[in-house]
A protein has these predicted regions:
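Electropositive, intrinsically flexible nucleic-acid-contacting patches
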Residues: 1-226
Length: 226
């Protein structure tokens, strides 16, 4: 049986909404953050390492690092000749598995597109569904409609995406909406959502138990006063 990796990197949900961040910057962000030391809260991968992990040119890495730093989503501390990277805390995030990030049959642009689009997917049973038109999605993820169309065609050929005509109509154009189904199992992303949802449910149960304990203590204190 194939071993499923549980390792993943977290991407802030609102990052793609910050101007002038583009999808390619998200790939670089994740390529850096995957090296984060949980104890120190820092990491120090070289530009060459980031370039290799992201599948991007050194100049692209430099530009993205500059953009991420200027927007406040990447903190750079210089110690001698070494650059240390850290990240501000964020409450909501999208998880991306190491297996997905390391997929060799996906191009840099395809990964950038999928990473930027993931937060707009309705995720269920190993599938991620998007009902936005290419034009609507282009506006949300800061990527051209033409590029999205080209990448979608490539993902369909690679069996990572299925596009189906919906019975629903676009309220403005009256044209049937195309529903896009991204195959998260094949993209090595489904297991991450399963684990993340499980952890969230555990945390919710823990919070409920703590709230119940607090309420019982309050009632006991009230009864004692009487």
């Amino acid at each position: 049986m194939e071993k499923i990796s549980k390792q993943h990197v977290q991407l802030p949900n609102n990052l793609i909404n910050i101007n002038p961040i583009t999808p390619k910057d998200l790939v670089i962000y994740l390529a850096i953050r995957r090296f984060l030391n949980g104890k120190t809260g820092e990491c120090y991968p070289s530009l060459a390492t980031i370039s290799k992990k992201a599948g991007a040119a050194i100049n692209t890495v430099r530009k993205s690092i500059d953009t991420l730093e200027k927007t406040g989503y990447l903190i750079i501390t210089k110690r001698g000749r070494q650059h240390y990277y850290s990240f501000p805390k964020d409450k909501t995030f999208e998880p991306f598995s190491f297996d997905f990030l390391d997929k060799e049959d996906l191009t840099f642009s395809e990964k950038a597109y999928l990473i930027a689009s993931q937060q707009f997917m309705f995720k269920e049973k190993g599938e991620g569904k998007i009902t936005y038109s290419n034009k609507e999605l282009a506006e949300k993820i800061n990527m051209s409609e033409k590029t999205i169309s080209r990448i979608n065609q490539s993902l369909v050929k690679k069996d990572y995406l299925t596009i189906e005509k919906s019975h629903k109509l676009n309220p403005i154009t009256g044209i049937k909406i195309n529903e896009k189904f991204y195959h998260l199992n094949q993209l090595e992303q489904a297991i991450v959502f399963t684990l993340t949802n499980h952890e969230e449910r555990i945390q919710e149960n823990t919070n409920d138990i703590e709230a119940l304990k607090k309420r019982i203590a309050e009632l006991e204190a009230l009864a004692f006063k009487k």
